[in-house]
Amino acid sequence: MKLFAGNSNRVLAESVAQYLNIPLGKASVRRFADQEIFVEIQENVRGEDVFVLQSTSYPANDHLMELLIMIDAFRRSSARRITAVLPYFGYARQDRKPGPRTPISAKLVANLITEAGASRVLTLDLHAGQIQGFFDIPTDNLYAVPVIARDVKANYATGNCMVVSPDVGGVVRARSLAKRIDAQLAIVDKRRERPGESEVMNVIGDVSGKDCLLFDDIVDSGGTLCNAAEALLNKGANSVTAYITHGVLSGGAVARIASSKLKELVITDSIQPTNAINDAPNIRVLSISDLIGEAIARTAAEESVSSLFD
């Protein structure tokens, strides 16, 4: 077994390698003057079980192209099996046609990874479960819930916690956390009462006096989270903390979170945190390196991965 990494999340890759007690593989990923990407594998991988870790986060197209070229390099170097380890799968929110004459980009990206030569995929908290079926190769979708539940139990009196889904579509995900910490579930329902009016946040469930835990897979602009936190506090919640797997946090999101009524935003390192995120007073990062490392170890040993979540 050998583990390699592109440039998107070297810190996580090094932590995973440490968990596995193996060195991170030697590979050069660099750019020519015209910004074309060039990859050189700097050690023998013939007959090896290769894992290449790369989040296709911002800049998504550069990191995706790095991944595809690395997979091709391993295939042409006679690796026995190539597993693409994608802690964050970019383009996941483009999983359906939003209107006529539009693409399903998540399916296209899955095809590209497969055609480049990947034998299987390991990823984390896909935005939509059906994306797992977009790949024509074995694909394991890991869940951050065990890591998050452990952190909740260490920091909160779970008897007073209420898990909240920030929208109707995330209820199944939120319920999985609520079940693990034995908490009740509430939902924030966004709707426009009349055309042309601003969105209204309706809270389904009694959150009065509760420590509310918003749980979702992606935070991007942060607007929905901040508005949901305000709605919950207006309904009498004691505090609001957000647990989110993938901290995209684009644009002015970090500043928006810092000035919001959220007690804390907790994200994982599926996307490498920026300096601004690390310096933010109310943003904390949980590592998923042990989870990813254990999934890799079990895959290499041909053992069950799903039993990690039993």
Swiss-Prot record:
InterPro entries: PRib_PP_synth_CS, Pribosyltran_N, PRibTrfase_dom, PRTase-like, Rib-P_diPkinase, Rib-P_diPkinase_bac. GO terms for cellular component: cytoplasm; ribose phosphate diphosphokinase complex. Binds 2 Mg(2+) ions per subunit. Its cofactor is Mg(2+). Its EC number is 2.7.6.1. One of its GO terms (molecular function) is kinase activity. It is found in: Cytoplasm. The active site is at 190. Homohexamer. Involved in the biosynthesis of the central metabolite phospho-alpha-D-ribosyl-1-pyrophosphate (PRPP) via the transfer of pyrophosphoryl group from ATP to 1-hydroxyl of ribose-5-phosphate (Rib-5-P). This is Ribose-phosphate pyrophosphokinase. It comes from Brucella suis biovar 1 (strain 1330).
